[in-house]
Amino acid sequence: MSFLPIDLRMIGKIRLFYINKTSISHSITTKNISLIKNKDNLRYLLEILDITKESKKYLEKENLVKFAKMIDKSWELKKRYQESFIDYKECNSLIDYAKNNGAYCGKLLGAGMRGFVMIIGPENKLNNITDKIKYRSLSPKFVMTNQPIIKL
């Protein structure tokens, strides 16, 4: 594993939106495990793994736009992989609105189908998006230490 230092200016370009719902992650995980047995579904997961490795390179170079494009690509694959048992309508509405208003990408965070949606984009665009939607937003905050922030 290696550590990535993060330029804190990038943090202002990330916003989390709480969609105020919960799910039972155990049942989602069980369904995911059963899907892996299908070779087409396994292909999606391997493709997401490749995208993750490529994303790390863009993050190391602090190229947030290309990093966000990789996040977007992996999110689209994940939705196809899980479309048989997860309804992403609410998340997609928020992500589509954000992308149509200048965000680079959006992605659901956490297990299951509810919780936080991460949106990445220019700070001024995120501020406008935040002002116009109904969800509570959070900006990530970090405490400065001598330790790297992300461990991969």
Name what the model sees in each region:
Residues 115:
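Conserved glycine-rich beta-strand-loop-beta hairpin in the small C-terminal domain of fold type I
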